[in-house]
Amino acid sequence: VRRLDGIVDVHSHNFPVLSAAQREVENSWLAANRFTGPPAPEWVADVALAFMDAHGIALQLLSMPTDVFAERAREINDRGAAVAAAKPDRFGFLATIPAAEPRRAVDEIRRAADELGADGFVMSTNTGGTYFGDPHYAPIFAELDRRHAPVFVHPSAPAGLELTACGRPGPVLEFVFDTPRTVVDAVFARVFENYPNMKMVLAHGGGALPAVWSRVAALGPLPWVPNPRAVTADDIKTQLAGLYFEMANAAHSVGPLLELTTADHILFGTDYPLSDMKVHEDYIRDLLNSTALDDTQFAAINASTLAVFPELGRRLSAVGAT
């Protein structure tokens, strides 16, 4: 019987305790993303630890993938660093990149890595409707590439959500499509060839990407598709196969993903504390029962995680947690 004993959760969120004014801003963001449920729960370390202990999770990488400006990113990252410093054997953090301001984003990447000891970085799938193939992101990707840094990509609402969501919350469907939207945009710009040292991890198994990548590879190179960089079907598959995939609420996508990439590109995450406990329990059960990964491959998930997040491995070794 499989168990999660000692696994690293690369997808969890440390939502802060908010003032009334901050909660109003948060609620505005939730409304813009068509969240119709309650606001995100405030994160409490002891409650998170109880969840982790109940499910065999050794450590969570905390992140806040909000589309914020530099000052807010600094606050988020300082808070994440403080949590990780207080319990370095149980929590790490991924620094928020203020992608709306590329030059200041580079400064924050440097500060978070060199001064705060971030285990990696996090960014949203788009910034005000601008996707990863846009030159807007070039300074950010160049700095991540220079550092051989991991970056966790979390879905966000697309521009024009009010026209496409059919009145439903963004996470129900539109988030699922925003990940392949930005990744495909990056592929046609040859982003992953231009920045080969950047390790990109896609949340939720890449959303709809496991279902659509072969269609993109088949149709993308056809003459009626805009393709100024002459990306071929092999180019598309090669770039996509180099990505990493975190599987929160996407256990049934493991099999299709293994037609694209290899088992060492599959990572574990929960999306805690979002959704509700039944969603977490069902997902973990489905992943443990999945036959897509054999026992050896499943047992190697942590080794894959530490290969993607080497700073985490070094820190855990320093505190005697590995």
What are these regions (language model features)?
Residues 85-89, 223, 291-294:
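Short helix-capping segments at alpha-helix termini
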Residues 176-181, 195-197, 222-277:
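Active-site-adjacent C-terminal substructures of enzyme catalytic domains
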Residues 1-59, 107-111, 198, 244, ...:
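Mid-to-C-terminal alpha-helical segments outside catalytic/metal-binding sites
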Residues 188-190, 194-236:
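Aromatic-lined glycan-binding groove of carbohydrate-active enzymes
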Residues 13, 126, 156-157, 206, ...:
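Catalytic metal-binding/acid-base residues of hydrolase active sites
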Residues 8-12, 60-62, 92-96, 121-123, ...:
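Hydrophobic faces of well-ordered beta-strands that scaffold small-molecule active sites
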Residues 58-186:
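Active-site gating/metal-coordination segments in enzymes
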Residues 4, 13-42, 158-179, 216-240:
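Active-site gating loops and adjacent loop-to-helix segments of metal-dependent hydrolytic enzymes
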